[in-house]
Each structure stands twice: as structure tokens, then as C-alpha cells.
Amino acid sequence: MLAVLLSPVSQAATQAATQAAFDPLLEEHQSLWLQGGQAVTPPAPDSDASLAADLTIHAALDLPEIRPLLLRYSRQHPERVLHYVNRSALGLEAQYLQAPLTPQADLMISSAMGLQYRLANQGHALALEAPNLAAWPANSRWRDELYAMSFEPIVMVARRDALKRLADLDGLRNPRDVLRSHRDFWHLLETRREQLRGRIISYDPRRSGSGFTYAVSDARQSPRYWTLVRAMGQADARLVSTTGAMLEALASGEVDIAYNLVGPYAVTFARAHPELVVIVPEDYVLIQRRLAFVPQQAPHPEAGEAFLDWWLSLQGQQAVASDSQLGALHPEVRGEGSAQHMREQLGDALRPIEIGPGLLATLDRLKQASFLSRWVLEFEAPAPFAGEASQGQGQGQGQGQGQIQGQAPSATQPELNQ
């Protein structure tokens, strides 16, 4: 349940944070121009980029994950100049809403499922008719306007040397047996708190929209979630706003275990860092799906629809499976890199975040503040006295135990980053 009573302090903190919100339009973003699979010179800064390109895609999806697919599509359509812009989810929405009646992008893709659903629900998305879109599974789209493009597990990542140390402490032969589930993670925080103090990292749900969505989904899936939040705080867990920040902290040796990371980013990073291991929880796995739509005012709506139709085609989905870690959703694509392969391995443990009105609940300010108020109370709850057993869900208000990167704790509006 999202609804809990707000304390006056939490309400004041939320109002202050809203008034002092950062400007997402000033954030840095990545841009890529392609034609025929080759990089091309971008137009002059004072020109209209949406008119210089034949296909403009604005997305909250890191370039390393989508670049191979953009190159493949560009080679297949050499007549088109393709412009790809990557922003945070909040920056993506803010840029669009600054001038929603002005032609900007031909396709918008975001991991912030609630934001995408809200824009489509408010009438910003075109109804599409391309054949592969019409055949897309009903549970992976909303009407004919909003389409799921990925099937991404939310995972944990750990340092191999840390798992080895913890396994030795518990007399386990296989270090992988130390951490296989959410329950194992909670057990480690309870029994190895001193060894892990300051060595855990996760999303700050007050500063990350994705982190907030995962926190809400965790709370819906597990009655133990609030004791997990309390245990993280008592272990001085560090909180950041992106999966990338977690991965960098792991690689540098600053932390040992990261919780609730975007799976594709984690897998790609771990391939270059063999000291890390990606853990897909065995008890339940949250599944994020990036959602895409063609804006009503797209400068080249037919180009945006054509790209999305290619992505969801059998050919496109085979490319998604082979060229990325995003997860192919097409029912005929099997094997590594497909949602079907994940279903065969994990079965009922998969928990896809549903595409529907429930997403709007994560955007309601009062419900956000209520949930975050409870989250702060648990995370900042004081550690038990020596020898005292952990006692369920915390109600006390103590000094904050966790380490929040970049700001002091407060129940603020999430910044809806990736």
C-alpha cells in the first residue's frame, strides 16, 4: 500500500524540495548522428535539428546499449539521416513538455514507464497502424499508442572477492550461495552488518524515478521490504541516483554489493569487469519495460512509426536479442537475449511492471510523499542495541544511518532519472 500518514516535517520537506527542484533542461545529454551506418557531421548549433534529420529519436536509453541497433537500422535505410538524443527520463519529459506543440522527436523512448503512460493517456501519442505494431501482444502495449520495447530484469551486483569473504565466514564452498535472493540480501544485512557497513549501495528513491518505481514494486511484492530498508540504513548503505554510479563504486572497490540495478547496464558493465558478478534474484525478479510512442507533433511521424515497426518485427527482435541486453519480447524469438528464455529459466519468479493505470499512482504527489515518508522513517531508524534482535518494521525516528550521496536525507519528489 502506498498510503501512510505524512508527518508535518515530511510535508514541509517535500514542499521545500519541490520549490528548489533542479532544472532538468540544463543537464548534459548525448547525441549521435548517423547515415548509412556512418557518423555524419551534425548541423550548425543554431539550426533546427529535427528538420535536418529524417528520423529523430529522443530516449532515456544509454548509447552503449542501443548503438548497435541504431547502426544496423541506419545501414538498412541509408537514405535517412538518423539523429539520436539520450537524456535522463526527467530531462526527456521536461524537454518535450517545454513545447509540446512544436515538432521535436519522431519517437520517444523512456524507462520511466509512469511518465510515458501519463503522456500517452493525456493525448500526446499518435495511434499507429503498422503491421508489427498491430500484432504486438496486448500485455506489452497500451491501446495503439504506447509500446513496450524491452524486457529488463532488475538485478543485484556483487564483487566476487566480497562474496568469497562472506562465504568463508559462513563455511560455504560456493560463494554464489551467499547471495541468490532478496531474502539472502536481507539475511546478510542482519547477520553481517559490521562486515558490510558502508559497503552497500542502492538507488535513492527520493532522487531517482526508476529507484522510486522499483521501491514501490518491491513493497508490493514482499512483506519483508520495510525490514530490508531498515537493515540497509543500519548498515550505512550509500544511496545514489543512477545504475552507472553504483557500477562505478563497485568497480573501484568502494562497495561490495549493489541492490536494484538495471539489468542490461549491469551485464554490459560486468563483461568488462570480471571482478563483478550479476545476480538475478531467484525469489522474484522485477521486470522493467521501456515504453515508446510517436508524438502527435512529430516532424516525421511515418519515420518514427517505421523504426518502431522494425524494432518489433521478427527481424528487429532477433537483432535486439543478439546485439543488446535489452530483452527481445517477440514470442517467436527464443534463446539467449529473449524474454522467452528468461521465462523458461525463472518462470513464476518474473514480475513485469504492468502497463496500465496503476503506473499513474507512482506519479501522484501525495502518494509519493506518503511512501517516501515511510521509507525515510525506516532507513533512518536507529540500529538496535548490542545483542538486541531486529524487530520487524521500524516506527522510531532516529539519526540517519545511511549515506546519501550529494544531499541530506529528506522526503523529496523523485527526480525521475534512469
Predicted regions and their residues:
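Short beta-strand->loop
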Residues: 125-134, 145-148, 274-286, 295-297
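Conserved C-terminal helix/tail region of periplasmic/extracytoplasmic solute-binding proteins
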Residues: 352-418
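Mature extracytoplasmic/periplasmic domains
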Residues: 295-359
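A bilobed periplasmic-binding-protein/Venus flytrap-type ligand-binding module shared by bacterial periplasmic
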Residues: 157-162, 214-217, 288-300, 319-320
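A ligand-binding cleft/hinge motif common to bilobed small-molecule-binding domains
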Residues: 114-118, 251, 255-275
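Alpha-to-beta junction loops
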Residues: 79, 100-108, 124, 196-198, ...
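Extracytoplasmic ligand-binding site segments that recognize negatively charged/polar headgroups
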Residues: 60, 64-67, 104, 111-116, ...
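Early extracytoplasmic/lumenal segment of secretory-pathway proteins
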Residues: 22-118
